[in-house]
């Protein structure tokens, strides 16, 4: 105590005061409201514990735990449980109890079941974690995380987080819900979805539903030499299972395999993706690409494999289905090789219908 050194003590009433640990590793077993056991002593009316130095351990025996904040900031190595505020705590075993964030910006990191919260190594926490108020930051080292359909919620391999504002996926994948999700790409490997700002996103499986990607330019993708429907790459993020794409006047480019495009005026579909606000110039890329044009007229440009539709200028196109519409040549000398019924070749393009 302040003036005495007691030994052979079994029970201590701290009268709503504080307890300080040693410079070594201490263990504190919380046994009830404002009660704990440490160093063979049963303490009651404990208000605060400063665990001090060493790799200290707090065991809460299933009690709920909240991270701690003061003066507008989350405090590392600090938590609250059953009326006791712990500081300088390196390890916490919740024995199935719930972990919640503080009123300020907390940091969480997960790798499978391994969980760190405000620098505390947390074990045996319940799977549901409410990150609390503040702009909380979650770093996920799992290979995949999944949206739930509710804003600010994310399921990792072992935990279900809510009230999360910022997530670092550590170059891993994100999966959408079975319903319609929206992904706003904000920069290289970065996007916003479900009101969460994601960074270090390697790939996104938008999953089922009528999903939307908003970005400023995209390239269609292929796998093993075959173009993949509903797939694209933008800002170093590989998207799959995407139904809709808004390019905000950015460019669309084809893959290195045979892509399919269809236009009807400004309406554009590319590898089964409905594309809006694409820049007018579209390079179809490598492969024997197929373009279906529902406009009443399309026009050659004088360059091989190039065709202007009503709203787009395609290059690197090998095959065009004019859907029983018209083709117009250039102001110069063009050659048209008729190859069959309603079929011809011109400017390196095989036209049908």
Place the predicted regions along the sequence by residue.
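Low-complexity/repetitive intrinsically disordered segments
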Residues: 1-22, 119-129, 135-139, 165, ...
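GD-rich hexapeptide-repeat beta-solenoids
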Residues: 16-39, 55-81, 98-115, 134-157, ...
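Short "repeat-start/strand-capping" segments in structured domains, especially the N-termini
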Residues: 44-46, 112-115, 124, 199-201, ...
């Amino acid at each position: 105590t302040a003036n005495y050194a007691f030994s052979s003590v079994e029970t201590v009433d701290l009268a709503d005061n504080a307890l300080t640990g040693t410079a070594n590793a201490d263990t504190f077993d919380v046994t009830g409201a404002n009660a704990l056991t440490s160093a063979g002593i049963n303490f009651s009316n404990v208000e605060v514990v400063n665990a001090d130095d060493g790799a200290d351990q707090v065991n809460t025996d299933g009690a709920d735990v909240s991270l701690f904040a003061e003066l507008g900031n989350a405090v590392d190595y600090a938590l609250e449980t059953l009326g006791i505020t712990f500081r300088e705590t390196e390890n916490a075993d919740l024995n199935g109890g719930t972990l919640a964030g503080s009123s300020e910006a907390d940091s969480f990191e997960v790798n499978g079941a391994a969980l760190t919260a405000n620098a505390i190594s947390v074990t045996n926490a319940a799977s549901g974690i409410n990150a609390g108020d503040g702009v909380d930051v979650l770093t996920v080292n799992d290979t995949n995380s999944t949206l739930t359909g509710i804003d600010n919620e994310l399921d990792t391999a072992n935990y279900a987080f809510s009230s999360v504002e910022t997530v670092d996926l550590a170059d891993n994948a994100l999966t959408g819900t079975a319903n319609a999700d929206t992904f706003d790409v904000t920069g290289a490997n970065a996007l916003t979805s479900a009101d969460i700002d994601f960074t270090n996103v390697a790939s996104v499986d938008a999953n089922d539903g009528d999903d939307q990607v908003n970005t400023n330019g995209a390239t269609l993708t292929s796998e093993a030499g075959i173009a993949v429907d509903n797939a694209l790459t933008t800002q170093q993020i590989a998207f799959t299972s995407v139904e809709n794409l808004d390019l905000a006047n950015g460019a669309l480019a084809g893959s290195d395999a045979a892509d399919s495009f269809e236009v009807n005026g400004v309406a554009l579909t590319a590898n089964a993706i409905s594309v809006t606000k694409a820049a007018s110039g579209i390079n179809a890329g490598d492969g024997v690409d197929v373009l279906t044009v529902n406009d009443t007229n399309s026009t050659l440009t004088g360059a091989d494999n190039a065709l202007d539709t009503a709203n787009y200028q395609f290059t690197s196109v090998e095959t065009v289905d004019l859907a029983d519409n018209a083709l117009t040549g250039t102001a110069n000398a063009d050659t048209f090789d008729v190859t069959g019924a309603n079929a011809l070749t011109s400017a390196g393009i095989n036209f049908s219908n």
